UniProtKB/Swiss-Prot annotation:
Organism field: Ruegeria sp. (strain TM1040)
Molecular-function GO terms, alphabetical: ABC-type thiamine transporter activity; ATP binding; ATP hydrolysis activity
Matches recorded under Pfam families: ABC_tran
Superkingdom classification of source: Bacteria
Residues in ABC transporter domain copies: 2-230
Catalytic reaction(s) noted: thiamine(out) + ATP + H2O = thiamine(in) + ADP + phosphate + H(+)
The protein, known as: Thiamine import ATP-binding protein ThiQ
Cross-referenced SMART domains: AAA
Keyword Repressor: no
Broad EC category: translocase
Cellular component GO terms, alphabetical: plasma membrane
Annotated localization: Cell inner membrane
Length: 231
């Protein structure tokens, strides 16, 4: 279980607080108004944003003092951050070793991840030679090779059209289900939450609300969510 215990996150005048528990292998969408702190929450879980107070715990272990690389977390950002001078294979390999000095078993892991995201045969292409959807798949492959227990998605597919975005969300859901990965995904689109998430965490007015079942929450939103949805 991922436990966010009495979190208190502060950045200048910004403040976010709350407590939440997320079961292992659960899929959770994080929604709320722009600027509410959705991305900041993911950064705190990953270790990029320090906490003013509180704890991040995974399976009972306190991760709060751990550096990002020491946490069982992989994160995919809005910009996939592919290196333009590197091939798909080389970009994916960065998820294992920034120096790309891979052992044979690690190289096999890279090949398997590339195939799993549907880029088999495109290993030697560079990002400029890929479509937007293929670039998203390459970035996802780099995350997969890390083989972490928690996957954080900060709207990595926001720039894709509806059909491609749905395709990527379905792929993520398949992969996380296959591997028992806990997923947290920031989204501005309630339809994305319905498509991929079992539960929703609402962030609004400085408050982190505990997870609630997706369809029940979106079909009968509380006041804090109603304004955001325009319901």
């Amino acid at each position: 279980m991922l436990r966010l215990e009495d979190l208190d996150i502060r950045k200048g005048s910004f403040c976010l607080s709350g407590t939440a528990s997320i079961g292992a292998a659960d899929s959770v969408a994080v929604i709320g108004p722009s600027g509410a702190g959705k991305s900041t929450l993911l950064e705190a879980i990953a270790g990029f944003q320090p906490l003013h107070a509180g704890q991040v715990l995974w399976r009972g272990e306190d991760l709060t003092a751990h550096r990002p690389g020491q946490r069982p977390v992989a994160m995919l950002f809005q910009d996939g951050n592919l290196f333009p001078h590197l091939t798909v294979r080389q970009n994916a390999g960065l998820g294992i070793d920034p120096n790309r000095k891979l052992r044979p078993k690690e190289r096999q892991t890279v090949e398997e991840a590339i195939a799993r995201v549907g880029l088999g045969g495109l290993e030697e292409r560079k990002p400029a030679e890929l479509s937007g959807g293929q670039q998203s798949r390459a970035a996802l492959a780099r995350v997969l090779v890390q083989r972490r227990d928690i996957l954080l998605l900060d709207e990595p597919f926001a720039a894709l059209g509806p059909a491609l975005k749905a395709e990527m969300l379905d792929l993520v859901k398949e992969i996380t289900s296959e591997n028992g990965v806990t997923l947290l995904m920031v989204s501005h689109d309630p339809d994305d939450a319905r498509r991929i998430a079992d539960q929703v965490i609402l962030i609004a007015e400085g408050q982190l609300y505990p997870p609630a079942p997706t369809h029940a929450l979106l079909d009968n939103p509380p006041p804090a969510l109603r304004g955001y949805l325009g319901a």
